[in-house]
Amino acid sequence: PLQVNSLSITPPTTPQDLAIAMGIAPSDIVSASLNGSDVLGVGIGSAPLGTFFPREGNTFAILSTGLAESADTPNDSDSLSYDLDGLNSADGNDMTQFILTLHTPEGINCASFDFAFYSEEFPEFVGSQYNDTFTAEAPLNVAFDSEGNIISINTVFGVTANNGTTYDGGTTL
C-alpha cells in the first residue's frame, strides 16, 4: 500500500527552489519563473512518489494542474480536482508553467531530465475533451512518448493504472 507522509510535499519558497529540487546547481540558474502560475500547482517532493522519484538526491519538482500537495495522498477518491488561480490555457483550463533559463557551460550542447506524467483523468476521460498534457519546450516541445506522441491522456501510450500515487494513471520514466 501507498505510504503517505503529509509533510513530503511542500510549496517552494521561490521558483529557483524548484530548479534546485531538480538537482540543478544554483550557480547554473540564470532565471526561474512560474510566469503567473498558481503556487499551489507546484511543490517540492522529499519522499518517494510512486516508484520513480527522487531519481537522484533527496528532492524533486512537482508541476500540477491541481493541488501539488495532493500527489502523495492515497488514491481513494473517484475524483481529484481543484481550480487553480493564475494561468489558463486558450481553452480556459488550468495550466502550470515553469520557465528556466540556465547557464550553459562551454562545450555543452545538450541537456536531459527525467519526468513521469500522472493524471486523474485516466482512463475515464481518454478520447474526450478533457486531456491533460505535458510539454517541455526548449524552444520546441521535446517531451514525447516512445511512439513519438505528445504526452497526454488522449495518446495513452505507456499510461498505466496503479502507479503508487493518488492519480488514476501514469507513465514510466
Question: What residue spans do the PLM features occupy?
Answer:
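Aromatic (Trp/Tyr/Phe) and Gly/Pro-enriched flexible surface segments
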Residues: 2-173
